Amino acid sequence: MALLEICCYSMECALTAQQNGADRVELCAAPKEGGLTPSLGVLKSVRQRVTIPVHPIIRPRGGDFCYSDGEFAAILEDVRTVRELGFPGLVTGVLDVDGNVDMSRMEKIMAAAGPLAVTFHRAFDMCANPLNTLNNLAELGIARVLTSGQKSDALQGLSKIMELIAHRDAPIIMAGAGVRAENLHHFLDAGVLEVHSSAGAWQASPMRYRNQGLSMSSDAHADEYSRYVVDGAAVAEMKGIIERHQAK
């Protein structure tokens, strides 16, 4: 049966995902940045309360995946922290200036991660040569690759995803970006074994007093009185679709 991973941005969201049938959680911060490394406090609270596998993302900033020496040092320290806290896996990825896997840095990450299952995230979708990259990731011992098939969403990239799955000795290929209940059957029918979804929605802040003339964001138009949460009903719906597909 296909595995359902839910992207979560808080301990509460991880619990919601677990309670509604998620098989695994990718734990992140900063949804508007596409997911950054969670704080130590969030990591500890999730480790204490969530029982399904949780893989934190290790990503120090938004933007591209070519990091300064200081950023890479922080990545290695965060990898060690996640390992020490007892998480079963993590999610990360580093590219060089030419859009190739930075093999030297990834080897250091893999050494720091030790027995943890490492997912190479959607840095893969920004790489220059996906098949060469897949070979490099297999050589590194990467457990899985999260990808949209190098398109803006995974449905558009499904043909590339299937090409990657068929590639000899490839890591597990997990489809992600825009995967929802309404299009999930396309991935299941194609034989995708792992899917990744935010299954989320923006929820209004409970704040009654709102200073509308002031923003804490560099984006003056950002809505600071909403937060991104996992929709438990959406998770349950996706899990049900997977179970019914398996029963066919």
From Swiss-Prot:
Location(s), subcellular: Cytoplasm
Principal location: cytoplasm
Pfam families: CutC
Keyword Cytoplasm part of the UniProt annotation: yes
GO terms for MF: copper ion binding
GO cellular component, one term: cytoplasm
Keywords assigned by UniProt, alphabetized: Cytoplasm
SUPFAM superfamilies according to UniProt: CutC-like
Entry similarity comment: Belongs to the CutC family.
PANTHER family referenced in this protein's UniProt entry, alphabetically: COPPER HOMEOSTASIS PROTEIN CUTC, COPPER HOMEOSTASIS PROTEIN CUTC HOMOLOG
Subunit structure: Homodimer.
Protein name: PF03932 family protein CutC
Origin organism lineage: Bacteria, Pseudomonadati, Pseudomonadota, Gammaproteobacteria, Enterobacterales
